[in-house]
């Protein structure tokens, strides 16, 4: 595989890929404490795509030629819930199942960081599900550290 490129501002032609790839990767994003039918997860993901369009954001696509390999959705200018300082937030990232383990996630994460710097945002936050070990390794290798823990209990 030749080196993939990252395109900023994914266009309308990328929408079907983003929806399909995002929905297919939902299984690794769901906590076992928050089981939900796949259709509910799909609906919520599509709602997320609509919500971010009302904020300053970028959708980045990793591609090799016309072949789309993964995408990341980063939102800017969000106030931190504790300090109130401006932050960027990686709202979603997905890589095609057959393309995982080839550096696509790292490429997209680097691009998100570059976009955050371009927006003069000194902090990029994200959340990762406890059971998603591959994503945790990716983020930790890139220098991300646990700041808080979100605890939950199934009732």
Please place each PLM-identified region on the residue numbering.
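Conserved GNAT-fold acetyl-CoA-binding loop/helix
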Residues: 23-48
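A short helix-loop-beta-strand connector motif used in the catalytic cores of GNAT acetyltransferases and
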Residues: 47-61, 89
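Conserved acetyl-CoA-binding loop of GNAT-fold acetyltransferases
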Residues: 139-149
């Amino acid at each position: 595989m030749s080196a993939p490129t990252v395109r900023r501002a994914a266009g309308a032609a990328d929408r079907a890929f983003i929806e399909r790839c995002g929905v297919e990767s939902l299984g690794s994003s769901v906590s076992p404490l928050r089981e939900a039918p796949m259709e509910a997860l799909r609906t919520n993901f599509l709602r997320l795509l609509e919500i971010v369009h009302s904020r300053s954001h970028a959708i980045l696509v990793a591609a090799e030629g016309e072949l789309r390999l993964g995408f990341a959705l980063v939102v800017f200018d969000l106030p931190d819930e504790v300090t109130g300082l401006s932050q960027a937030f990686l709202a979603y990232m997905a890589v095609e199942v057959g393309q995982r383990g080839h550096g696509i996630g790292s490429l997209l994460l680097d691009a998100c960081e570059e976009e955050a710097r371009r927006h003069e945002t000194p902090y990029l936050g994200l959340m990762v599900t406890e059971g998603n070990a591959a994503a945790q390794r990716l983020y930790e290798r890139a220098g991300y550290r646990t700041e808080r823990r979100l605890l939950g209990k199934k009732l």
